[in-house]
Amino acid sequence: MLTLYPRADDAGSSQAANRAIRECVAGGVIKNISLMAPPAAIEHAAVVLRDLDTADVCFGLHVTLNAEWDGIKWGPITNPEEVPSLVDDQGHFLADPREYVGRISVPEALREAKAQLDKVRALGFELSYLDEHMGVGVSWVPELHQALVELARQEGLYHADVKEPLPAIDLSGDVFARFKRRIGEYPEGELIYYTHPAFADPELEPCYNADVPKGKISRERDAERRLLCNPETKAWLAERNVRLKRFSEL
């Protein structure tokens, strides 16, 4: 039997994402919501998402140490002068997590991660786990990843990037058909299903960079929202006896 941990990442990155994630939870597929503390829309996330029933969904901190888009930037909650290895000369996070290789100070990164934990908790979210935005530690800085695993342990949280992920699904064309093919490749096991739902909205126009053209994020994230809100998606998973679980159940 296959068990999925469906996770909606980037809550707090935009109001369009916050509204879409709430809709996806109502659709019955999303069971975990990862919150980004640095972007301004985290305040909106508290209004839109905080009252969701934790018997149905759990919240985690999406530890955010980079700002990947050219059209919108964010920086640390900590005073940038206290975490110089994390910021550029404008006080923003670096764009690509690979830029932190050989540069990042793990103590500074932990100070910022703790500040992010404090912020989302102060907004009223009960956290069950943490994970890493764009795999900053798990993919690029192993010593940071180990430090975040230890931080999670100290805080009584599950580190949600230690399980194998479901490989990404192409979000163009017939997304439901692609989704079914991908799930069909895994008759059993436990996988994290990373998602980034959002409404197609002008708010996402700044989400572009040298690798991601303007408009792509809005189109793809809206396609993912529609997949996750489609009643056929949940029904098909149930027919295959795919279990959908929260990290809080671990």
Question: Predicted segments — roles?
Answer:
Residues L2-Y5, Q15-F125, Y129, V141-L250:
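Terminal accessory/targeting
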Residues A8-A11:
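DG-centered beta-turn motif at the end of beta-strands
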Residues M134-S139:
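Short histidine/acidic/glycine/proline-rich micro-motifs that form metal-
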